[in-house]
Structures are given as C-alpha cells and as structure tokens.
Regions:
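Pre-Walker A (Motif I) flank of P-loop NTPase domains
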Residues: 18-25, 51
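Inter-Walker segment of RecA-like/P-loop motor cores
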Residues: 60-120, 206-207
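ATPase catalytic-site recognition across NTP-hydrolyzing enzymes
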Residues: 178-233
C-alpha cells in the first residue's frame, strides 16, 4: 500500500508493533486511544484476506456514539479506505473489505449470547461497561489479537484478572500525547477542578469509586465464623 491512509499518533504505532496478544489501552479523555485502535483495525483488515474483526461495546447506542462513529469518520476521510471498504451495512454495522475481511460492531446481552461466533481480532471498547463473563467468552473465541480500552474511573476486571498476565501489554495515554487536539481542548481538560476526576481524565491514572459511605474497605473471599464477629446483646 503506497498511498497514505491517514495521520496517526504514537499510540497507533505502539499498538501496531506490540507482539503481545492482548493490548490494554488505559487512558484519559481525548487521548486518542479508541480512534487509534480503530485506525489499526482497518489496517489489520487490509493486511490479510478474510479477517473477522469484532468490536464490542456495552450496548448498541454506546457503540454508535463511540467506536462505530469513529470508524465511519476514519473511512469517510480517506479515499484509500473508501476503495478498500466500498460497502458499509448500516443496519448490521459491518464494514466489508474487498479482500473478504469484515469489521463488525456488536454488543451481547449475556455470556451465552457471546458464545456465538469466532473471530481473528477482538476490540472491547470502554471495557468497564462490559461484564467479565461476556469478555471471557469472546476472548477464548479470538484467535489472534485482543485490544481493550477504557477510562480508568475505578478498578475493575482488567486490573484484577488481566494485567498480571505475561501475554498482556498495558499502554497508558492522556490528552497531552494527542497532537490533533486544539490548545483550547487541552486547556479544558487540564482545567478539571475535581482532583479525582483530573487524575482519571487528564492523566489516565486509575481512580477510586466516589460517593461511598465507607470509602476504605477490603474485599474478602468469605466471612470468618459467626462466633468471631457476632454481637452479644
């Protein structure tokens, strides 16, 4: 492919060149993580014939406002991609490549629903809105690569079940690496006043759950015997 597809951020290159099976993209708002992954999925679809690439979100409305909208914008801005992906089924949310590859966008109501279908590449968009049991069914039916992205408003199954695996690479990004933003957009994000929200959305750091009556707690596998904690009245 000698023609230029699109301009990319360093995050695109980092994900493209990573040899780990699972690429986790934790980031603040407007870091370019979803957009960069969608650009890469177009590239992956073009590189090999007959690829099945599945993009998963919490539900269809969120997909349409997020990664699916990004995908349409990326394709529509590139004459080269329009030649490679001449057909888009809006009803089924599928991009068809001339080499037989497809990029499909879907959500799943439960783990049983997620057992249907296999794929070469999986992208779980805003993964903290997708239950782990659904992710797992999709993950074990994916042959090649898995991409995950999210805003880290609080710890969830990615932190507990994936980050300690040897086949996982974590990328942390924030708006400062997104050179396509305007100075006003950067300033707006930097101007977030709440410290916890600033940490999450301006720096891509993992936040804590807010609004809890008991903000400090530990999760245990089981309670001790009742005789050790019951109250005598």
């Amino acid at each position: 492919m000698s023609e230029k597809l699109f301009d990319v951020l360093p995050l695109y290159v980092a994900n493209r060149d990573c040899r780990k099976r699972t690429k986790i993209n934790q980031g603040g708002t407007s870091s370019g993580k979803t957009y960069s992954i969608m650009q890469l999925l177009f590239t992956r679809a073009m590189e090999k014939c007959g690829q099945v690439i599945t993009v998963v979100g919490q539900d269809i409305p969120n997909l349409k406002k997020g990664s699916y909208r990004d995908a349409k914008n990326i394709r529509n801005a590139s004459p080269v991609l329009q030649k490679w992906f001449p057909k888009v089924n809006e009803g089924e949310r599928i991009f068809y490549c001339v080499n037989g590859s497809i990029i499909e966008f879907n959500s799943y109501k439960d783990a049983q629903d997620a057992k249907n279908g296999k794929r070469n590449i999986l992208f779980v968009n805003e993964a903290n809105g997708v239950p782990f049991d659904i992710f797992w069914q999709l993950y074990i039916r994916t042959s090649d690569e898995v991409f995950i992205d999210y805003n880290p408003s609080a710890r969830f199954w990615v932190h507990e079940k994936l980050l300690n695996r040897n086949d996982v690479q974590l990328f942390i990004s924030d708006h400062r690496q997104n050179t396509f933003l305007t100075p006003e957009q950067h300033a707006m994000i930097e101007g977030i006043e709440d410290d916890e929200l600033w940490k999450v959305y301006a720096r891509g750091a993992t936040g804590a759950i807010t609004g809890l009556i008991f903000p400090r707690f530990n999760v245990v596998d089981a309670l001790p015997p009742r005789e050790e904690w019951k109250m005598n009245v």
